Regions:
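Catalytic glycan-binding domains that act on GlcNAc-containing polysaccharides
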Residues: 7-171
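N-terminal Sec-pathway targeting helices
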Residues: 1-4
Length: 171
């Protein structure tokens, strides 16, 4: 019995190594400010950069949340940020979380649509929702035509469920 309890406790600690909550001071701050679930933010960071603040994608997205130059310019104007350093963890998390907040409002809290839009663009998601080929009801997607976005959405949702399991249900 004691061995079972020890194994369960240790297993949860081991899982936390693979699902970290690094940069928690910034994630907590901007999660609260922009009303975005902190475990969604961690899931995006894990998927996008594996918590590497210097990560750069082949498409030129940068930092922890893989912010594109276009999004960084838009966010810096909206948030009145001068001298943007996209590799600065706080700035990157602030911009990424602000963008998730915008997507949350646009897609009325639908996680799958938010995540798909974060990767594939909100314009594409709106277009797919209008197409009977990709949506039965105009509110959700039956399929995502971009393979990368489809795989990305599944991966972020899987990571999100795991973060919830580890940090919410295993307390």
């Amino acid at each position: 019995m004691l061995l079972t309890v020890v194994l369960c406790v240790n297993y949860n600690q081991i899982e936390k190594i693979f699902y970290p909550t690094e940069y928690s001071e910034y994630v907590e701050k901007y999660s609260n400010e922009y009303k975005v679930d902190k475990y969604l933010i961690y899931s995006i960071i894990k998927t996008e950069s594996k918590f590497d603040p210097d990560a750069v994608s082949p498409k030129g997205a940068s930092g922890l949340m893989q912010i594109t130059e276009k999004t960084a310019l838009w966010a810096s104007k909206e948030l009145n940020i001068k001298d943007v350093d996209i590799y600065d963890p706080e700035t990157n998390i602030r911009m990424g979380t602000w963008y998730l907040h915008r997507l949350n409002k646009e897609f009325k809290g639908d996680l799958s649509l938010m995540i798909s839009a974060y990767n594939g663009g909100s314009g594409n998601v709106r277009k797919w929702l209008k197409s009977s080929e990709y949506s039965d009801d105009g509110k959700s997607l039956t399929q995502i035509p971009f393979k990368e976005t489809s795989q990305y959405t599944e991966k972020v949702l899987k990571n999100y469920r795991k973060y919830i399991e580890i940090y919410v249900y295993s307390k």
